[in-house]
Amino acid sequence: KTKAALENLKNKDFVFLHVEASDEAGHDGDVDLKVKTIENLDARMIGPIYKEVKTWSEPVCIAILPDHFTPVELRIHVGEPVPFIIWYPGIVPDEVERYDEISCVTGGYGLLRLRQFMEVLMQY
């Protein structure tokens, strides 16, 4: 998936990469597995994609977020806003150092619903 995403980014304006692992861990109610799957995604997909696109002359925007909120306590999908990260050359980072539902709310964008998130994303 990582290789395919990078190849498509070379000639497409938008690439959507969907990974199910952390959602399944939420359904299982396994917080340790959910953390491990997110760390694995960072090491095997997000990190390599970020490292590669930083070297490109054409800027690329990266957004990282789940497709829905699946709290391990509830083990079901809920309609709450999800934590997200947006990276683009020139965006000044905020003070958030952890990727989780509580920390991301304190970030520069706060809590956004889908329409608001897409409006922000399309600025880049």
Model-derived segments and spans:
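Feature captures the catalytic ectodomains and active-site-proximal regions of enzymes
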Residues: K1-Y124
